[in-house]
């Protein structure tokens, strides 16, 4: 359990400690590492306890704790997904325009703020619908969605804005980078 955040802590430590590594790229990498650390320290222990022995810790099943844990789980997962397009954008500018100023510090800070804001706003409905329920004489912490139009709209909007578009953006930048590198190789020959 203690080894889970170790890799991300090492990444965070090395990018913060070394002045050469204080760049826009590393701001995005630090953001990704922070999300991973938070998930491994907050969400993973909760999930392990629930999976291993649902009877052991009654306090986990309080409504507030249950809601906070599910909400944070969704936030950290969303931040992780949303960080990849920012890294892809930075890589795109670094490869295609290596000698120019790419993304400013202010813009990269704004992008990180946007990532966290988007993740929190997109995860708020989970906080609202999470509850403690009894299943087979055991309390469980779960999302209790009513299968309604509102739920369908939330799922569609969340998946489009937080999963599909970010993944598509990453693929787009990778294709553009590949195309640019292929074109530069053809010019050399």
Where is each model-derived feature located?
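Intracellular signaling interfaces of 7-transmembrane GPCRs
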Residues: 12, 17-27, 91-111, 171, ...
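Extracellular TM2-ECL1-early TM3 structural module of rhodopsin-like
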Residues: 25-87, 94-104
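Hydrophobic alpha-helical transmembrane segments of polytopic
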Residues: 32, 111-119
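Class A (rhodopsin-like) GPCR signature focused on the TM5-ICL3 interface and adjacent 7TM helical core
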Residues: 83-95, 127-136, 157-189
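Residue-level signal for the membrane-embedded core of alpha-helical transmembrane segments
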Residues: 3-6, 76-83, 168-172
């Amino acid at each position: 359990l203690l080894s889970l955040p170790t890799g991300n802590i090492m990444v965070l430590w090395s990018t913060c400690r070394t002045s050469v590594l204080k760049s826009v790229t590393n701001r995005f990498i630090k953001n990704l590492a922070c999300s991973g650390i938070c998930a491994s320290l907050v969400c993973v222990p909760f999930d392990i306890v629930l999976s291993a022995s649902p009877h052991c810790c009654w306090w986990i099943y309080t409504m507030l704790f249950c809601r906070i844990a599910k909400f944070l789980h969704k936030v950290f997962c969303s931040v992780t997904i949303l960080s990849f397009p920012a890294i892809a954008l930075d890589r795109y500018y670094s490869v295609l325009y290596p000698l120019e100023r790419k993304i400013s510090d202010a813009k990269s800070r704004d992008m990180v703020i946007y990532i966290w804001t988007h993740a929190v706003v997109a995860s708020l409905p989970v906080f609202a619908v999470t509850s403690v329920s009894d299943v087979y004489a055991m309390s469980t912490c779960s999302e209790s969605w009513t299968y309604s139009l509102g739920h369908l709209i939330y799922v569609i909007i969340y998946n489009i804005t937080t999963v599909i578009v970010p993944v598509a953006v990453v693929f787009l930048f990778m294709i553009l980078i590949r195309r640019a590198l292929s074109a530069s190789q053809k010019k050399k020959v």
